[in-house]
């Protein structure tokens, strides 16, 4: 993956921190295209264990993707609706139990879990329907990050915010491989989990506090994306 992408005619601008290759991390990233997965693997794959992505159940029907997901032991989420759970209450915690089982395997090994908190890829139409207060992002959902934190809490070394930007590019795997993504900007930054948010929210006030923390991260990410899309890197950059 790294060899393929680093041989393409792309101007790479990667800024921010390098992670401990033996660390266990929860990664929060914005999501615009399928190529985001490749980019996260490029920026993390050299120094850390191979990232694992929370994946929607619908994607298991897609060739290649399903094989990779099973082989790499991705946590695959069905995301049951309230109607589903009403008819079958036992489904309420099934995603959590499954993810916890997957991410609890080999607890002595480093683990990097990537969650796209927006829950779907950004498009102008989704942005309009989402009524997002952000210019370049959809509103973050808290369920995925909470689930990942619950699964990794006892061995988590840090939370990582990754911001992906593709100035002036049309985003698809074909555009990437045909040389039509001229520039990729990636910023990596570790963030702290505020005191009081270490445990799973159990009350409305705790849920509100967790949501407020996620919204503050997204506000900073949105401002960073604006700078990156205007061609301004966050600091001194490095090669992939």
Describe each PLM feature range.
Residues 6, 25-88:
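Catalytic core of membrane glycerolipid acyltransferases/transacylases, capturing the structured
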């Amino acid at each position: 993956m790294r060899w393929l992408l680093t041989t393409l005619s792309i101007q790479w601008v990667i800024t921010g921190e390098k992670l401990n290759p033996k660390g266990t991390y929860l990664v929060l990233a914005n999501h615009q295209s399928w190529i985001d997965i490749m980019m996260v693997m490029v920026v993390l794959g050299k120094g850390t264990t191979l990232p694992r992505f929370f994946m929607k159940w619908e994607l298991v029907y897609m060739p290649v993707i399903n094989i990779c997901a099973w082989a790499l032991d991705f946590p695959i989420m069905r995301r049951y609706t309230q109607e589903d759970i009403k008819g079958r209450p036992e489904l309420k915690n099934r995603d959590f139990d499954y993810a916890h089982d997957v991410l609890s395997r080999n607890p002595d090994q480093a683990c990097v879990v990537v969650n796209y908190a927006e829950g779907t890829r950004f498009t102008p139409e989704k942005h309009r329907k989402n009524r997002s207060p952000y210019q370049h992002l959809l509103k973050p959902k808290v369920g995925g990050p909470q689930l990942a934190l619950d699964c990794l809490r006892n061995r988590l070394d840090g939370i990582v915010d990754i911001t992906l930007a593709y100035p002036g590019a049309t985003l698809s795997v074909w555009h990437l491989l045909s040389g039509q993504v001229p520039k990729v900007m990636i910023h990596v930054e570790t963030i702290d989990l505020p005191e009081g948010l270490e445990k799973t929210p159990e009350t409305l006030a705790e849920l509100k506090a967790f949501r407020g923390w996620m919204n503050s991260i997204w506000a900073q990410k949105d401002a960073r994306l604006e700078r990156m899309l205007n061609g301004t890197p966050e600091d001194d950059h490095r090669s992939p």
